[in-house]
Amino acid sequence: MKTRNLLYTCLVGVAALLGTASCTRLEDTSYNRIVADGFEPTDEDVASLLSSGYVSWRKTMLLWNGVARAEMLCTDQDVIPARPNGWVDGGVYKRMHQHKWTSEDDIPLQSWVRTYDGINACNRVLYQIESGQIKLGDRQTAIVSELKVLRASYYYLLDDLFGNVPIVTRFDVPEGFLPDQSSRKDVYEFVVKELTENIPNLSERVDNAYYGRFNKWAGYALLAKMYLNSEVFSDGTHKDYDKCIEACDLVIGSGKYALEATRKNVFVTNNEKSREIIFALPFDETYVDDWNAFDFHMYSLQPENQATYNFQATPWGGVCALPQYIDTFDPDDRRLRDDFIAGVQFSATGDTLKCTMGNLVGRPLDYVNHVNSIDGSEENQGLRWGKFEYAQGITNRLSNDFPLLRYADVLLMKAEALLRTGRADEAARLVTEVRRRNFTDHPEKAAVSGSQLEGTTCYDYGRRDDSRTTHDGAQVKYGRMLDELGWEFSQEGRRRQDMVRFGVFTTRAWFSHDASDATRNLYPIPNRQILTNGKLKQNPGY
């Protein structure tokens, strides 16, 4: 049974505070109401107030067509090809794979709308506090700072995905208010300023009360991520790699976090006690009841795998890993077998599962590292996602918490920043530290050198489907570092960001994808938003 914390129990407090009828739904439908003047909440009510801002992170990241898809389905790691049972869906996944999305597509739209929902929730509670409607006494400074850091985390997403977006910091805006658009550089500087001014006021506690919330160390980890991406996020006006190292050192020096000896423990169902997780999105199949709350098992595994795990719902069988990506792994790397499901599939009682569709009906369901093309595939093609534990008997929703920031990320952010500032050997020691647990049977393979990190990638870029084969042997600066990130962080909703930072997102081909245009490093502002706000100017290339 998962430990219930602030974000599992938040709705009871929110419902009591705001007078809503529901105490189980996590849909943000009634926060436009302001609490009564002079209401003084208890400690539990304060947690509930904060949770209204945190709930949007779950929706933003992992609900259907959320940010996780925006960060993964367009990359060199993952693909949803057409399957015998569908997955064409109007061509949306093909457009994502080939970087041909438009301002009308739902994935950019949901990424924008849900992120601003989170910002609005933060602004609403800040308004209630700062206007005196909610009196917090000595707690006010810390709570206001936490809300501002949380709000900044949403702007981090917007800076990454869209770049040039409105910065809205008020809830009490006049009727008909339309915010001005800010440059990507201004958004970057706003986020950094909000974080640096407010992190010192955050709690240093690492316990159940602060799980799934921004404490000081989660704040510094987010700040490090901003600094690591500074050159991209600021349109080249900042190169804050030394500041990234400083922020990482504050997290490392706290002594609050550590690598799990067994990496898989970060991703098990009951992972809330992991010392590696710095900031997580809590999920529970009972308390988080959005239909697509966290459904990696549903849209990766084939329907037949219901019998493997005794799922309460039948999987749909869509997304898989790209063969070129799988081919980059050392066969002795535990992450290859821990993160992906391959080979012949069996039921929970040991019976061999058989294919039920396409050209393979009646044959054993045997996941193979081959996919025909984006336009057509057999149901056994492509290794399936398996990084997060799929517990026996679960519903269509996983109960694993989703780690957005973890200690391995801090170590590798520092390593990359060291590499980019000419300290490759120091970087190599950190990378080796992260690799070591993944090569326990072959410890000699864990070590990596500075010169290796400075070298190119082992990814065999080039078009590689049944219709066409091309080869791209061009060098990738620090490509081995990009490989290390790819091996460590698959299925964690971040590959696009890493590829953009290393300059390969729009310049390389893979599977059924040809090199695209640099304008695809940003998503388009959804057309619906431009029609609503005439002050918004579309990103170049759309």
Positions of the model-derived regions?
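Bacterial Sec-dependent N-terminal signal peptides
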Residues: 1-32
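Flexible, polar/acidic helix-loop-strand segments at domain edges
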Residues: 93-99, 327-407
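Conserved, well-structured interaction surfaces
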Residues: 43, 47-51, 55-60, 85-162, ...
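Short coil/turn linking the two alpha-helices of tandem helical-hairpin repeats
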Residues: 157-160, 166, 229-236, 422
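Long, intrinsically disordered, low-complexity segments
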Residues: 22-25, 40-43, 54, 62, ...
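An aromatic- and glycine-enriched ligand-binding surface/loop that stacks and positions planar moieties
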Residues: 24-89, 188, 196-197, 201, ...
